[in-house]
């Protein structure tokens, strides 16, 4: 190994924990994984980490809609996300969550250092407030009519029709997306990060030459328009970390989200019992390399706020950002109605992971270009390249080696010059992997595959096999073909981990980057089994149809009682524990003079009598029928003075009202006074 081993930390953008992973996400995670696998093959110390981005208003509100706690929701999402990434063989060393002890400690540390260094400012701002939900509204949680083009139903920050940007206060007839209420303006003290103080440092970082040209150019535009102070706080209710010494104020999700990179790495170090590496990687003068693989939509946060936060709190800055474009399918934005908004899990029900990994790699470069997943081209390319060119090379030769030579390869290379051509290509292909010019690497490898297949075509082992006295030639030709296959698979190992594992089992040797310098001579291979099957358009059709069906299922309207009476906001166990429910015997029931809705119930709690007024008369026109029944009551409800007397509790009933009211009754065996738990 001539290279000096490097210490490298690689991250992907943290998936938001309120939805499933789809093929747009997978572009980034595949791109990063291919680069990481190549670095590992070259002997570098690589730590590859990620986490779920688990904070913010959308998560809080979605959990409420589902009737579960945010903690429950993000735990379920984390399991789903990790299953999807494992299915695509994304080789993370650690996958964590921003809702973690490590992230809380680091977020508070960075904030405290920024505050101590004078980079946190306080000021009062006016925001739209939902009076029904009792919460301030983020821009995307306000909708109204665009103030520019007058298009209805537009978000509070920009119009999707005319493209205009504006303040949510400029919307015409704004409404809260959460409750439908008309928001009002309210003042609140917020905390701001003084980003303009870091303008000079950020411009120097931009000019260093490390960033992609397109990123540097975009940053220059932001510098010219002037950097603004960044609001890093949000008001309760909010799911996130409370700001130290600021009750009711929480860190904005974009403050603690990138710190999640540090939190995940700290968690990994702690799991390993490693007390040294975290500081080695994150200290200001660290010689480790730090790379963030991200989409072009979050460059602003990663190229401005994040390095400035790190600089201001005494940590190192990223070595570079690797930015990619978006994914389109069949030349258009992913569409749920067309079945091209495809979840990662749905893909894996119809295709293997290697097929998408290969197709994305074949199209990726170091530029920030959008990638189109053309499903017809996908089928053709996978079959033409992986099946016809690479796998076919092994299958054309393996049978002869197994049947005629008991799996043993020849002792010498049939064409050393051709083999040298293949091994010499390692420099060009390696540089392409290194510089993230994946498409170029694939083109170079497929050009070699064409050479290998041309060699086999010219040598025609199927003809030689029929000629007497040419066993040595047959063994040499087929051994040459298998050795060339081994080189190709070695170069493809960062992209095709599943296929390469099967190839290693057949070749009876591990595929290592430097290993190709020594061909397999006199080496015994194992029996050949089909390495990869052709894919068909009917699989694509099934995939698209399955995606459509998933959308229909997800969009199915809620019917029945939940539609009429949605589950209310989540409460804590402590809140529930305050309610004292007891079994009660209805000792007497009678009409209430002057009321056509109420019945007066005398309830026996086995030693204590309660007088309760209940609005159940419409369902029980004969109150005498209730006498002697057991029911359930709220025993610690504060007494309520009514026109007819004092009500000392509440009986429990179900139903929408009118005649459809159903008094709850405990199962047989329950006794008056027993607590309902």
From Swiss-Prot:
Sequence motif 'HIGH' region, location on chain: 15-25
Alphabetical list of PROSITE patterns matching this protein: AA_TRNA_LIGASE_I, TRBD
Any GO MF annotation of the entry: methionine-tRNA ligase activity
Family: Belongs to the class-I aminoacyl-tRNA synthetase family. MetG type 1 subfamily.
Gene Ontology biological process terms in this record: methionyl-tRNA aminoacylation
Swiss-Prot/TrEMBL catalytic activity: tRNA(Met) + L-methionine + ATP = L-methionyl-tRNA(Met) + AMP + diphosphate
EC number(s) per entry: 6.1.1.10
InterPro entries named among the record's database cross-references: aa-tRNA-synth_I_CS (IPR001412), Anticodon_Met (IPR041872), Met-tRNA-synth_bsu_C (IPR004495), Met-tRNA_ligase_1 (IPR023458), Met-tRNA_synth (IPR014758), Methionyl/Leucyl_tRNA_Synth (IPR015413), MetRS_core (IPR033911), MetRS_Zn (IPR029038)
Location of this chain's protein in the cell: Cytoplasm
CDD domains in the record: Anticodon_Ia_Met, MetRS_core, tRNA_bind_EcMetRS_like
Organism, as annotated: Cronobacter sakazakii (strain ATCC BAA-894) (Enterobacter sakazakii)
Cofactor binding notes: Binds 1 zinc ion per subunit.
Cofactor: Zn(2+)
Lineage: Bacteria, Pseudomonadati, Pseudomonadota, Gammaproteobacteria, Enterobacterales
Keywords on record: Aminoacyl-tRNA synthetase, ATP-binding, Cytoplasm, Ligase, Metal-binding, Nucleotide-binding, Protein biosynthesis, RNA-binding, tRNA-binding, Zinc
Disulfide cysteine pairs (residue numbers): none
Protein name: Methionine--tRNA ligase
Function statement: Is required not only for elongation of protein synthesis but also for the initiation of all mRNA translation through initiator tRNA(fMet) aminoacylation.
CC terms in the record's Gene Ontology section: cytosol
Annotated binding of Zn(2+), by residue: 146, 149, 159, 162
Motif 'KMSKS' region per record, residues: 333-337
Subunit-structure text: Homodimer.
PANTHER family membership: METHIONINE--TRNA LIGASE (PTHR45765), METHIONINE--TRNA LIGASE, CYTOPLASMIC (PTHR45765:SF1)
